[in-house]
């Protein structure tokens, strides 16, 4: 399972860099585990070059028993007897009703990913099909993502829509008090600032300082400590954009593990903005640009393990995500070398009044459920 979590983390940083090419300074928020799960379902029915490209881009080549590992991971994430937080990862295929999908593929998808095939009439009722898909996603994300497919996203030529939704709502183990929240400036870059609702608390929390990139790392656990938000904050803005350039260049699985391994509980004065991010991505161009091109090309895609025919291809991967961070905790949804320890003072400052990276981690499996950059209110 650790190999699978590592693969998903590798992929999340690769995808972040790709998204960054067209959005170097804006807010970013997506669920790598959600996108990886969706594409792993496609991989079950992919063959030849198409399968090789998916495996390579998602770093699945090093993962033994990939699909049974996903089955275990999904079961761990979707634990039913947890009362302290809500976390739901849901998958579904919507296929054109006249199109024949192979029984072996359907049973494998059901067994490994708990995903059913919903049959819809794309040919003569594409708009009704779109509404049905949106309703399903809205239900899975508790209404936070009401419309994953916008008007015109499907048409009479659509054969298959792959939908993956993830929803999370959790309370902080140590909540911020609402009376401590105040209007404060948030520095976007060296020249601009905006006002945010800045939360505050002083608590004993896992903390680390990374001198080589002048960054602070803070872990904010959720109730029961099964999940945490980890925030990586540069000391200040030292470049001409968000102040995150050096940190983003250094991002890797190895570095993140290194930075978060040696965290020490210490009294920290935490200043963190309340924020809400919503993002929508059409990932076809990014994934194709990363080397997963065949899947989206009629004539090149080999999904013969799904249907036995050669005319099936994926037209788009649409991913929508939502996160809200407040005094109580977080609500989020998405669809489709040793470290030199600095001499720690008794108290540390963690003032997130300028751009930072953050991720929400499932601690037992070390899986990054959500990854984001907060750079502008």
UniProtKB/Swiss-Prot annotation:
Which residues are recorded as modified (N-acetylmethionine)?
A: 1
Q: Which GO terms describe its molecular function?
A: serine-type endopeptidase inhibitor activity
Q: Keywords for this entry? A: Acetylation, Cytoplasm, Protease inhibitor, Serine protease inhibitor
Compartments where located: Cytoplasm
For this protein, the record's Pfam families field holds:
Serpin
Acetylation recorded as keyword = yes
Gene3D superfamilies the record matches = Alpha-1-antitrypsin, domain 1, Antithrombin, subunit I, domain 2, Serpins superfamily
Q: Name one GO cellular component term.
A: extracellular space
Q: Which InterPro entries match?
A: Serpin_CS, Serpin_dom, Serpin_fam, Serpin_sf, Serpin_sf_1, Serpin_sf_2
| Site positions per UniProt: Reactive bond | 344-345
The entry's family comment says:
Belongs to the serpin family. Ov-serpin subfamily.
What's this protein's function?
A: Regulates the activity of the neutrophil proteases.
What's the protein here called?
A: Leukocyte elastase inhibitor
Instruction: Give the organism the record lists.
Output: Xenopus tropicalis (Western clawed frog)
Gene label: serpinb1
